[in-house]
Regions:
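Short, Lys/Arg-enriched N-terminal segments with co-localized hydrophobic residues
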Residues: 1-13
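Catalytic-core signal marking the mid-to-C-terminal active-site face
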Residues: 15-18, 28-41, 49-66, 386-499
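Short beta-alpha connecting loops at secondary-structure transitions
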Residues: 23-27, 306-312, 340-347, 375-387
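N-terminal small/glycine-rich loop or linker at the start of catalytic domains
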Residues: 35-37, 41-44, 108-130, 330-342
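Flexible, glycine/charged-enriched surface loops at secondary-structure junctions
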Residues: 51-61, 73-75, 155-158, 214-217, ...
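Glycine-rich, N-terminal phosphate-binding loop and its surrounding beta-alpha-beta segment
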Residues: 56-58, 62-128
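Helix-rich catalytic cores of soluble enzyme domains
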Residues: 132-364, 368
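A glycine- and small/hydrophobic-rich beta-loop-beta segment
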Residues: 300, 320-343, 368-376, 383-411
Length: 499
C-alpha cells in the first residue's frame, strides 16, 4: 500500500485508456425557455443590427446577397433575415468525426459526447529546465505533441503554441509536420492565409495517402477566427473557412467575445452576441458548400475590469462554456468550446482549482470538443510541458465523473456481500480483484497517495516537480510514432521544413 505507482512515462497499467466519448449533460446552466430566448435575441441582432465586414470579401458578399441577405455597401453592413439563417443551419451535419491516423483516437462529435484536448497559440513556454518563460518555438510543438501522444486522457492535439523561429510563408506547413511527426491523434490547426491552407492540405494529403483519402477521413481540421467580436467578419479567416468547406475539411468556427470589452458585461448578452456570430459563420459555410462539417465554436470569456486583461480563470468562464453546448445543441450542431484556462503563471494551486472547475463544468455540460483543457497558463499566453501531465489527470477525473455509477447485479455485489458475511473484509474477495482496476480512477501516477515517510524518502517532490520528471522521461523515450521515410522524404522535397 505504501509503494509509489508506476508513472505513466514508464507504462501504467492502471491508467484509464480511451477516456473520451462519455456522455455529459448533467449540468445545464440554461433552462429551455432561456435557450430559446437567447436564440431569438441572436436572430433579432442579425436582422436588425447586422454584421460589418472588412474589405476583400466581394465574392462572399455576392453569395450572401444572392441568398437573400441585405447588404448596405455604403456602411459595410450585412443584415440576415431569420429565414436565411434557419434554412442554412439546417444543412449543417449533426455529427462530425475527426479522424486519427491509427483509428484508435477517432473523435465522434455528436449529442452530449465529450472529448478534451489541447489548444492555444501561446507565445511563451515555461521552460522545464529553468522554470522561466521563454519564446516558444517549433521544437516545442513537436515535444508537446510527443507528451500528448502518451497521455490517454488528452484526446486530440490542437497546435498549442507559436513557432517564433519559423517564417510566415512556411509557418503552417512546418507546424503540421512537427505535430504529425509527434502523434497519431487528430490535429487541429489554423492557417495564415489561403496559400498556407493549400500547403497544409497538400501536406496532409501526402500523409493520408492522397487528397481523396484525406477527404474521406480528414486527419486534420481547421480553426478559423472568422468573427472579430463584436459582429465583424475577418476577411482572411472567412476565406480560409470557405476554402476548408469546399474541401470538406472540418471547420471550428471560433468566436471569442470578452464580456465587458468585446461583448456586453452580462453573460446573457455575451451569449446572445456570440450565438449571432456563430449563426453567421454556419450560414456562410453552408452556403459555400452544403453539408460541410462544421463545429459551433463559441469561446465566451470576460475581461478583468481591474486590468482589462483576459480573465481566464473565472468561474463564469466554465458556466458560459457549458451554456455554449446547449445553444449548439438547440440548432443540432456539434460544438467546440473551451475549459482549463487559468490566470496562474506557473503550475500551482491556483492553476489547479481554476482548471478543474472550468473543465468539470464544460464536461458535465456535454460539450463535444473542449480545447484549452490541457497545458495552458497565464490566460492562454503560456504553456508548460509539466502542465500537460497534471491536466491529463484532471481530465481523467472529469471523464470518471461522466462515466457515473453503474448499478446492476454485478456492481450491487449481493453475492460478494453474502460470501464475505458480517464482520469479514473484502481485501481478498474475487469481486474486489475483478473491479479494483476499473471502479475507481487510478490516474497517470501524478497524484501522490503514498505515506509521508515514503514520500520524504523519495525526495519530497511536489506535484510540479513530479510532473516535470514524468514529462522529461516521456521525451527521453523513443517516440511512439514517426512518419515513414518515404512520406517524410516527399514532404521535405515539397516543403521547406525547418525541424
Amino acid at each position: 500500500l505504501g509503494e509509489a505507482p508506476e508513472i505513466l512515462a514508464e507504462g501504467n497499467e492502471m491508467g484509464n485508456k480511451n477516456s473520451g466519448g462519455h456522455s455529459g449533460g448533467q449540468y445545464r446552466p440554461l433552462k429551455p425557455e432561456q435557450i430559446e430566448r437567447i436564440h431569438q435575441a441572436a436572430l433579432s441582432i442579425l436582422e436588425n443590427i447586422g454584421f460589418t465586414y472588412e474589405q476583400g470579401l466581394d465574392d462572399t458578399l455576392t453569395m450572401l446577397e444572392d441568398a437573400g441577405a441585405k447588404i448596405d455597401h455604403a456602411h459595410s453592413r450585412i443584415y440576415f433575415p431569420p429565414d436565411l439563417i434557419l434554412s442554412q443551419i439546417a444543412n449543417a451535419p449533426q455529427q462530425v468525426i475527426l479522424y486519427s491516423r491509427d483509428a484508435q483516437n477517432d473523435i465522434d462529435l455528436r449529442d452530449d459526447r465529450v472529448y478534451m484536448g489541447t489548444g492555444g497559440m501561446a507565445v511563451t513556454v515555461v521552460d522545464i529546465e529553468t522554470g522561466q518563460a521563454r519564446e516558444s518555438c517549433l521544437q516545442d510543438i513537436y515535444n508537446i505533441g510527443r507528451i500528448v501522444d502518451r497521455l490517454d486522457n488528452i484526446h486530440f492535439y490542437l497546435r498549442p503554441c507559436t513557432a517564433h523561429d519559423v517564417p510566415a510563408s512556411i509557418y503552417d506547413a512546418n507546424c503540421m509536420y512537427a505535430a504529425m511527426q509527434a502523434t497519431n491523434k487528430h490535429y487541429m490547426t489554423g492557417a495564415i492565409d489561403r496559400q498556407s491552407f493549400r500547403d497544409i492540405l497538400t501536406l496532409a494529403s501526402i500523409v493520408a495517402g492522397n487528397e481523396k483519402k484525406l477527404a474521406e477521413k480528414p486527419i486534420f481540421s481547421l480553426i478559423t477566427c472568422f468573427a472579430i467580436s463584436p459582429l465583424k467578419l475577418c476577411t482572411q479567416s472567412t476565406l480560409n473557412m470557405q476554402e476548408a468547406c469546399r474541401h470538406r475539411i472540418p471547420v471550428a468556427l471560433s468566436s471569442a467575445p470578452m464580456a465587458g470589452s468585446t461583448s456586453p458585461m452580462t453573460m446573457a448578452g455575451t451569449l446572445a452576441q456570440l450565438h449571432a456570430e456563430e449563426l453567421v459563420g454556419l450560414t456562410i459555410g453552408q452556403l459555400t458548400h452544403p453539408g460541410a462539417p462544421m463545429l459551433y465554436g463559441g469561446i465566451p470569456g470576460s475581461a478583468n475590469m481591474r486590468t482589462m486583461g483576459y480573465q481566464g480563470g473565472a468561474v463564469e468562464f466554465g458556466m458560459m462554456n457549458a451554456a455554449i453546448h446547449q445553444l449548439a445543441a438547440h440548432i443540432n450542431v456539434p460544438n467546440y468550446n473551451s475549459s482549463g484556462l487559468t490566470d496562474a503563471k506557473i503550475p500551482d494551486a491556483q492553476a489547479g482549482w481554476e482548471k478543474a472547475f472550468s473543465s468539470l463544468l464544460a464536461a458535465m455540460g456535454g460539450s463535444n470538443y473542449i480545447h484549452h483543457a490541457a497545458g495552458m497558463l497565464e490566460s492562454m499566453l503560456a504553456v508548460a510541458y509539466e502542465q500537460y501531465i497534471i491536466d491529463d489527470e484532471i481530465i481523467g477525473m472529469c471523464a470518471r465523473v461522466l462515466e457515473g455509477i453503474i448499478v446492476d447485479d454485478e456492481h450491487l455485489a449481493i453475492e460478494a456481500i453474502a460470501d464475505v458475511g458480517p464482520g469479514g473484509n473484502y481485501l481478498m474477495s474475487p469481486h474486489t480483484l475483478a473491479h479494483m482496476r476499473s471502479e475507481f480512477f487510478a490516474g497517470n501516477g501524478i497524484t501522490d497517495g503514498r505515506f509521508r515517510d515514503i514520500w520524504v524518502a523519495d525526495g519530497s517532490l511536489d506535484t510540479r516537480e513530479r510532473a516535470q520528471e514524468m514529462a522529461q522521461k516521456i521525451l527521453e523515450r523513443d517516440p511512439c510514432f514517426k512518419l515513414d521515410k518515404r512520406t517524410e522524404k516527399r514532404i521535405r522535397n515539397d516543403f521547406d521544413i525547418r525541424m
